[in-house]
Amino acid sequence: MIRYKGFILFLLLMLIGCEQREELISNLSQRQANEIISVLERHNITARKVDGGKQGISVQVEKGTFASAVDLMRMYDLPNPERVDISQMFPTDSLVSSPRAEKARLYSAIEQRLEQSLVSIGGVISAKIHVSYDLEEKNISSKPMHISVIAIYDSPKESELLVSNIKRFLKNTFSDVKYENISVILTPKEEYVYTNVQPVKEVKSEFLTNEVIYLFLGMAVLVVILLVWAFKTGWFKRNKI
């Protein structure tokens, strides 16, 4: 009898402590999911990964912190795109395209690689890079290259040093670009205010709310356990039922 009471108490505690979670984002790689969870936990939001197999990994959070988690993902521009591999942009078995199209694809890949590299600089949260490349034929005089950068940063005290580091990095990346043709616009990260709100209840019908469903499930489990206990202990026979 004591054993069954302990088991019943354990099930009740599990039902009471069952947290309502909501899927924040899905179809992620392991790296993307880890980056999101790292940012959320640094801001006191509990999150967990769920492996969906071929559908990738999803991240779940408590319903009360869902809105704050969405704000953090927007502020940190998450999830970060997968690492760009230049060889994947030009597979050996692909159809031969025009030189202009090949050049455009190459510069697009370079822009993405540079964006990923700039995030490695301290204080840079995310970055977007645009390169004005010349698509004209070689016999036509080429125009000077310009590079524009929009970066979200996290260290307002070092903004001037950050601009200098970004420009120096890009100048050493492209030998043909002039220092004065590199423009960098810094945008400070938004101030984050944690809010733990009550989840919005989705009423499926007048009687079919989540609380009612959990209550009926708990009662059903208890009834089954009590019936099993009654049959095993002979309670029905002793009471002539």
Curated annotation (Swiss-Prot):
Its main location: membrane. InterPro entries: AMP-bd_C_sf (IPR045851), FliF_N_dom (IPR006182), T3SS_SctJ (IPR003282), YscJ/FliF (IPR043427). Residues 1-17 form the signal peptide. Transmembrane segments: none annotated. It comes from the Bacteria. The keyword Protein transport applies. GO terms for cellular component: cell outer membrane. It is a lipid-anchor. NCBIfam families: III_secr_YscJ (TIGR02544). Involved in the secretion of the Ipa antigens. This is Lipoprotein MxiJ. The gene is mxiJ.
